[in-house]
């Protein structure tokens, strides 16, 4: 057969799943005699039972059934393996059933029919199993229910599935196509092994010479070692070694052996290693504690994996395993194979143990109970992790910040806080997350899904934790208490925010204006002042708002709802805050006090506006003339000067006003209302400002002084009139005649000359006058006072 060594490195991984070495039950079995079992206590018996059950399940999971169908259930009910062996020995099948236990073969009528056949052979050189397959059976496919036999130097496959024969000069016959390999007769020596991936197909022949694993103890007795039985084309002259190793220089008589020479010894065929244990006196394993040598089939409790050797290595990732079963299960991570499917939800698993644990999700079985709190768990590992909560154990420490964790998974997720890694991305908006569960919750923002419903009010939530927190609204539970003042909170985050009141800490700073905030959310909201962002829009009128709370307050305008009513006067309010502020009118409470002037205010907003009097702050600027104002309402009123807008109209005379305050004062002129009374003389006034000015007549106060001549005035308007004496400025011009006046009031009086208006009438004789001073002079005629 032509050599294909050149193809070997490139295609090494292409058929690894096909070349997986066969797993014998002997590789993983733990066998005790009846006397040895009698030395075990109950805990050791339970451990032995668990190990054997898992071994059987693992073999079943990869398609190997080297036992009766009910053996797993027998093991689970603590029936003993040695009992089954002893009963079989009485029936005359001692050697065969021992092989079934240790090697994984079977006996007719005792074991179920298996799927494939493997044999052990003898050869003079060693090759790993999958290399034999590579060199001999590239195009061969194993057919089920075929029989094999050794014929000379060739391995032939018979079509007769019941055919079993022994050849002259050979110590081996053939069995029905099986998955596990045993000799069919007791030979003195010369066992040859061929793994699962080496089986040729029906009707084909393959040369087995130089392609089989050899037991060094039997090489001399091999019929293949006779040069007369070898092919001249393949066998070099005696002593000749034409194939040297490039690394160490050692020569080999066959080129096919060279690649195996370069393979790590731990990767040699497992069947050869297993076979070597049957030689008398052979002690493959040695206990480092006691020094005892033992075969795997004479395992003692303290001899479990004594050397810690992991001879089964994955060619894909290099990971090593102590048994071939573990390697087979591991290899499914590369192939993606998941043979165990849940009938309830369709989820698939690569291991039977994980599948069995998953089924408890549907059955809600929780067999593992915590002795401390009684909490149940579906998996024992979850119970062990939970018990760390009671012990306060946190074995996983972060080297960056020293924070401890009870679970390794939580520790790994936490490390992403320091690394900034966010491997989980949202497909819709691209937002990243450090672990999977927040991504699942985030996706519900896009889908609108709210799977968690409150049974009390029907409100939906995207996260289960939000539902638990919300439910405290109904129960009134406040588990988080401030140690400083004893105030309770339903959420831990609210407690953390509250504690900033005591510490005064404001960790979150605005990079634009430097203002500090105790919460990051408040900083984010504040930044909209600088960006002008208004993400919340009213569906009714289209108005935008920077805050969701402002939108909710605004929407009450459209509904007209006033759910908050004052118990003292019955007045209704749309917002609770307005009700609280109104109630201070009745109580007289003014909790906001100015430290500069000791003035008090009932509302916080009035207090903040007042403070600008002392600071001189005028944050609201007119875009037309640049004039500044301390309040936004002042800016809005001022802008009407430029637009000429007068939205407030008098129903009596039709006069318009820019400001609501001016309109209110004007209406009192028609009604005669004068609510502000002087306590000294009883005179009434329509405006509080006029009362304050009048009181200066009694006090003699003249706060407005002329800087030119030092003359003082009680009113600022009088000072402005006086200043025109020094400047001789006449700003107010008559459009009819061009005459100038220093005061607007004098211009208005002058314009009556042109209009003929006489608004002042005598109540006694009905005579009209254009000026108030002239009416006053006329009234003295009727009173008889000296003119």
From Swiss-Prot:
Q: Which residue stretches are annotated zinc finger (C2H2-type)?
A: 243-275, 312-334, 340-362, 368-390, 396-418, 424-446, 452-474, 480-502, 508-530, 536-558, 564-586, 592-614, 620-642, 648-670, 676-698, 704-726, 732-754, 760-782
UniProt KW Phosphoprotein keyword: no
What CDD domains would the database entry show? KRAB_A-box
Subcellular locations according to the entry: Nucleus
| Keywords associated with the record | DNA-binding, Metal-binding, Nucleus, Repeat, Transcription, Transcription regulation, Zinc, Zinc-finger
Report the main location listed first in the record: nucleus
Q: Does the keyword DNA-binding apply?
A: yes
Q: Which residues form the KRAB domain?
A: 23-94
Q: Which GO BP terms apply?
A: regulation of transcription by RNA polymerase II
Gene Ontology cellular-component terms for this entry are: nucleus
GO molecular function annotations of the record: DNA binding; zinc ion binding
Primary role: May be involved in transcriptional regulation.
To which protein family does this belong? Belongs to the krueppel C2H2-type zinc-finger protein family.
Protein's name according to its UniProt entry: Zinc finger protein 227
